[in-house]
Amino acid sequence: MAHLSRWTLSQVTELFEKPLLDLLFEAQQVHRQHFDPRQVQVSTLLSIKTGACPEDCKYCPQSARYKTGLEAERLMEVEQVLDSARKAKAAGSTRFCMGAAWKNPNDRDMPYLEQMVQGVKALGLETCMTLGTLSDDQAQRLGEAGLDYYNHNLDTSPEFYGNIITTRTYQERLDTLEKVREAGIKVCSGGIVGLGETVTDRAGLLLQLANLPTPPESVPINMLVKVKGTPLADNEDVDAFDFIRTIAVARIMMPTSYVRLSAGREQMNEQTQAMCFMAGANSIFYGCKLLTTPNPEEDKDLQLFRKLGLNPQQTAVLAGDNEQQERLEHALRDADNQQYYNAAAV
């Protein structure tokens, strides 16, 4: 199916209903038209402010409403964040994402957030933040500081959304994405598979993303990480083929976007991850932790890359960053023996 400027639910449902191998073949063809199939973007995610979030997202251990044993932490000092960014770069990351457990940032925190963005960019890394809902002014300030990407996930379809979150409307999420666009910041937005949604809900999520005025440049597809103490802790496991199918449909619908294999990789074996890359995933988070949930260690990722013939993508902001390229090549050669710093530990 050719890429459409605007998708309908029936067209997306038709993709989900395709035989899996046919779907993977189409997704891989689309992927090769727009990307080097051997290149994978490598990002690191750091929790710069952990826990005590007032929202009620049923999947999230950072919500103050659930007893998950997570200790709340205040906003990190700027230099602490920059130190983690330096170590992330040394381990091979080219993109550094900073997440804060807020409904929305307070204006008094904006100067520190701006300094974090400026400092990380000065290291030659792409920058991304996820801070919750933004005002017009906050989005403009982050844009002026040089923020490259802003992450704000839609999570699921509009129809299923109210079963998962009640403290923030779907429209608020869409409004924040619009403000980010208007501030000149690229959009990172995706969702979660395994919330209890139907295939129609998965189609509805991707429909919302692909039909935005400009589709997100980055689309993280998460597999639910079930955390004891959250309302979704006992949800049924996601079938691996259903997850792979979602990746493939996302690739076909948003052919020029990075599709990120995000949370839940710790639960996936190498074969499942390999099929996700075949389905068009071309970005991962690198490091043992995604905010507060487990993620494969860096050396395991590099070993898998080597087995599959994949290479970390060179996307450093500073041109001619040969030192970083040498680090990555060295890491790939020595993946069996080296241990890498967990830049996302908090």
Curated annotation (Swiss-Prot):
Pfam family for this entry, one: BATS
UniProt catalytic activity: (4R,5S)-dethiobiotin + (sulfur carrier)-SH + 2 reduced [2Fe-2S]-[ferredoxin] + 2 S-adenosyl-L-methionine = (sulfur carrier)-H + biotin + 2 5'-deoxyadenosine + 2 L-methionine + 2 oxidized [2Fe-2S]-[ferredoxin]
PROSITE patterns: RADICAL_SAM
Residues of the Radical SAM core domain: 38-256
Keywords: 2Fe-2S, 4Fe-4S, Biotin biosynthesis, Iron, Iron-sulfur, Metal-binding, S-adenosyl-L-methionine, Transferase
GO molecular function: 2 iron, 2 sulfur cluster binding; 4 iron, 4 sulfur cluster binding; biotin synthase activity; iron ion binding
Pathway(s) the chain acts in: Cofactor biosynthesis; biotin biosynthesis; biotin from 7,8-diaminononanoate: step 2/2
Binding positions ([4Fe-4S] cluster): 53, 57, 60
Cofactor (UniProt): [4Fe-4S] cluster; [2Fe-2S] cluster
EC numbers, comma separated: 2.8.1.6
Cofactor note: Binds 1 [4Fe-4S] cluster. The cluster is coordinated with 3 cysteines and an exchangeable S-adenosyl-L-methionine.
Binding site for [2Fe-2S] cluster: 97, 128, 188, 260
InterPro entries, per database record: Aldolase_TIM, BATS_dom, Biotin_synth/BioAB, Biotin_synthase, Elp3/MiaA/NifB-like_rSAM, rSAM
Organism domain of life: Bacteria
GO annotation, biological process: biotin biosynthetic process
Family: Belongs to the radical SAM superfamily. Biotin synthase family.
Function in brief: Catalyzes the conversion of dethiobiotin (DTB) to biotin by the insertion of a sulfur atom into dethiobiotin via a radical-based mechanism.
HAMAP family in UniProt: BioB
Subunit description: Homodimer.
Protein's name according to its UniProt entry: Biotin synthase
